[in-house]
């Protein structure tokens, strides 16, 4: 199958087909060294660009090398990934014309501070490469963080109010003691 790497309007470089691809075909394998997620996190902590692909339960990662690592994300993809016998294949979802850029939905699942902005330009673009499940998880975590911040602020305000009341009470008590000593 003829594939080539060239400039992409989605992101830097992309993978394009030079021949027609039928629906349901194994287009290319996602290859590279397999490392643990912890090793990948440490190795790529400060790297703005990675070609990592989580497999199995997500504890193992393929550090992408080869043609498949240039396949960009799209919210309206023409391919999908499938794990078969421990190997990751990019499969065509529909017939793909020669010259068309290959894409699949990354469905990122382990978000951090990065918003993983999507630039696919699809009509149904969700503006991020995170999966719907990860988006929901991040929103829930953000709400919990906001609730904790509000609760902490409320506790601090209550403590300040209590301290002011305690201070006044102590002052009145000291004034009474002084008055009775005379």
PLM regions: where:
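Catalytic cores of histone-lysine modification enzymes
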Residues: 1-82
């Amino acid at each position: 199958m003829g594939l080539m790497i060239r400039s992409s309007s989605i992101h830097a470089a992309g993978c394009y087909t030079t021949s027609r691809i039928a629906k349901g075909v194994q287009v290319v394998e996602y290859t590279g060294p397999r490392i643990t997620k912890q090793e990948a996190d440490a190795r790529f902590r400060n790297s703005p660009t990675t070609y990592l692909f989580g497999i199995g339960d997500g504890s193992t990662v393929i550090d992408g090398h080869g043609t498949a690592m240039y396949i960009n994300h799209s919210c309206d993809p023409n391919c999908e990934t499938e794990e078969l016998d421990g190997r990751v294949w990019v499969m065509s979802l529909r017939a793909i014309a020669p010259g068309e850029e290959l894409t699949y939905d990354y469905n990122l699942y382990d978000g951090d501070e990065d918003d993983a902005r999507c630039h696919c330009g699809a009509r149904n673009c969700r503006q991020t490469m995170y999966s719907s499940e990860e988006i929901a998880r991040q929103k829930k975590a953000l709400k919990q963080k906001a609730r904790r911040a509000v609760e902490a602020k409320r506790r601090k305000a209550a403590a300040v109010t209590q301290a002011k009341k305690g201070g006044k009470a102590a002052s009145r008590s000291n004034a009474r003691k002084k008055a009775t000593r005379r």
